[in-house]
Amino acid sequence: NLQETAFTECALNGANLRGARLTQTVFNQCEMANLRVEETPLDGCIFNHCTLTGSHFTGCSLQTVQFMHCALEDSHFDRAIPERSVFFESPLTHARFAGCRFLLTTFYGIDLRTTVLEGSQFERVVFFNCDQRGKNYARHGFTGCQFTENQLDGADFSGAQLTQCNFKGASLQTAQLNQVNATQALFMEANLRGAQCRGSVFDQAIFVGATLEQADFSQSRLFQSILQQVNAAGACFTLCDLTYSDFTGADLRLADLRGATFSRTRMHRANQENARFTGRQGILEYDEEVGAAEAWSRQRQ
């Protein structure tokens, strides 16, 4: 029974704590490489500045567990269930999290490029300032997750569920977002230059201030999406459903909108130089209410 026990600067390399009662147990600056704690519930435990390389947390229930500045390279968390847990600036190089169920868990400032996350489910998980370039998240489920300020260039989200996810300020250059469901997702100020977003659902998604240069949204649905002030020069929106979409102030130079469906689609003050259209029926070239608000704003300055 290690409930509420505190270990400080202890040598615990290779320790076997399987089946131990680990509730509100604290480990400070301990050497714990190759720890074995498989299939054991951890509740409210804190690992602070510990060496945990090669440790085995396979099948563990991790309730409100904090890993703060820990070395977790080559560790095993397969089939674990982290809930309300935190991985803070703890290297996870070649660590394994296959088949995990993450709920309300935070990854802060971690390079996840070599971390195995295949077959895992993510609900309301926060990835803050993490390097995830080139990650393969094809057909993974992300619900209400935060990818704020993440590096996701070249990541593959093909067929993924991204409902209500937040990619504000993230870099998604050349990322694969084909056949995704990104309903009500947030892409404010994100960089999707050259991203592939074909055949996807972006209903009520918000792209305000995003970079969409050369991105391909062909055959996608952007019902009620907000694309104000986006840089979509050279982007492809062929055969898209742009019903009630708002391109106010957008840069659409050289964009391809042939075959797109328009219905009360706002193009107020959008730069459409050399953009290609099959027809313009359903486009609102000038929004009187927005124009009046702009005039009022200028008078107030």
Predicted regions and their residues:
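Tandem repeat scaffolds
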Residues: 1-301
